[in-house]
């Protein structure tokens, strides 16, 4: 896939298919450590221990109908090509956590891509609540790592946080798919993502 956001959308959809009612997506760009970490945690049915060794096998599926899932093997291959890895932990009845790591500056690492489109697509699908956290630690200025100090504690991070459960609570009976809410949500996510790259 040309963008990591497409891998993320695929993993989010896997969570929905596993019966999740809440998914937590974390994207951490640690520029000082030259690391990009993507983590998706859900409260779905989980994966049986005897099936876990096969989740990254492109020739294995537990499905009896529909397509064979290549999303996880492709994500793992993308991570490994960038000096990273992909791992899954899961517990029946509790949920599943997928973690993928990449060398942030690796030449072969696909760009994060259209996170706004990915998030809007998933959120407006309405299948479950999503908490999204995107954190960038440090920044590169002319090829050198610079700090983002706020003068108080010299924090070197920026973070955008979006939780649809909190938004739904504020909206009451108004659905996220309402045209005005949808427009606000797109603007909120777009502006939140933009704050992570501002100098």
Show which residues each predicted segment covers.
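Conserved ATP-binding N-box helix of the HATPase_c
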Residues: 1-28, 78
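A short beta-strand-to-loop motif within the catalytic HATPase_c
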Residues: 88-92
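Short beta-strand-loop-beta element adjacent to the nucleotide/active-site pocket used for signaling
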Residues: 28-38
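Conserved glycine-/histidine-rich ATP-lid loop and adjacent helix of the Bergerat-fold HATPase_c
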Residues: 74-84
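N-terminal assembly/transducer modules of large multi-domain enzymes
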Residues: 104-199
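Short conserved segment of the HATPase_c
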Residues: 47-58
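Acidic ATP/Mg2+-coordinating residue in the GHKL
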Residues: 42
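Glycine-rich GHKL/ HATPase_c ATP-binding element in histidine kinases
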Residues: 94-96
């Amino acid at each position: 896939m040309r963008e990591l956001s497409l891998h993320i959308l695929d993993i989010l959809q896997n969570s929905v298919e596993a019966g999740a009612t809440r998914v937590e997506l974390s994207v951490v760009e640690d520029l000082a450590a030259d690391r990009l970490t993507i983590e998706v945690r859900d409260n779905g049915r989980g994966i049986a221990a005897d099936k876990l060794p096969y989740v990254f096998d492109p020739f294995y599926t537990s499905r009896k109908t529909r397509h064979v899932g290549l999303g996880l093997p492709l994500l793992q291959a993308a991570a490994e090509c960038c000096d990273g890895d992909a791992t899954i932990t899961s517990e029946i009845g509790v949920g599943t956590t997928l973690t993928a790591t990449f060398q942030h500056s690796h030449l072969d690492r696909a760009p994060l891509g259209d996170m706004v489109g990915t998030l809007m697509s998933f959120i407006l699908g309405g299948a479950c609540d999503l908490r999204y956290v995107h954190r960038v630690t440090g920044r590169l200025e002319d090829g050198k790592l610079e700090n983002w100090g706020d003068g108080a504690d010299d924090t070197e991070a920026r973070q955008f946080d979006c939780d649809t459960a909190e938004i739904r609570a504020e909206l009451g009976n108004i659905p996220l798919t309402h045209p005005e809410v949808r427009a606000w949500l797109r603007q909120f996510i777009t502006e939140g993502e933009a704050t992570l790259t501002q100098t």
